[in-house]
Amino acid sequence: MADAATTADALRTDAGTDHSVLWRRLHSLSGVLPLGVFLCYHVFENLSALRGPAAYDEMVAHVNTLLPRGFFYLLELVTIVLPLAYHALYGVWVAVSGRPNVGRYAYAGNWGYLTQRISGGIALLFLLVHVGTLRTWVTLLGNHLAPVPVPADGLDLVTYRDVAAHLGNPASLGVQSIIAGDHIFALYVIGTLCTIWHFTYGLKGFCWTWGLAVGRLAQRRVTVVAWLLFVVLSVATLSILFQMRFGALG
């Protein structure tokens, strides 16, 4: 009966807020395709940091030669910026208009809903700092956070030393500021874990919403896969962050 009451509450909430099925499905889809796929790729490419500054800088330079500059920016706008903006704005609206009921029904699904909303807010704050600093302040505006050689082609790219300075690595010779230091490292640790959790937990909802996991057995399997993905991405990301924060730059 408690499950039925929870479902009834959910139905009443949905009926009273005029949520569009289409917008909810697009929100779910955008969180996985393309944003979730890009997250996995971004973690994978940044694993080069574990091999040192030269390998990381070489990876960044290689990625930026794969496509013409104009097409690269267009692809970034269409596949990352716009989906992220929609997913974030709609997610904020859902978080503000929703009414978590963990106080009345302390089921795993209700707690999952609450943690999904909280992790999404923290992830959004982290992404604003991450993109605003490394993509905009450094790459687009050319304001490096640590001493770097002047690029021969005039194209400013984020370097290993930039990221190390951003995270507060003293060996980077970067200056402690509001966008660089130990507080940023703490934000990155918390923010990346929240981002990964938000994605992997949302992956379950995506599979259920789109009918990819029908039945309890399929849903349990998806849950196991989501947890494994969370662990793998978290270990990889924390390894990268700790390497760039505490590792040598020589």
Annotated model-derived regions:
Residues 1-250:
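Membrane-embedded alpha-helical bundles that constitute the cytochrome b-like, heme-associated redox core
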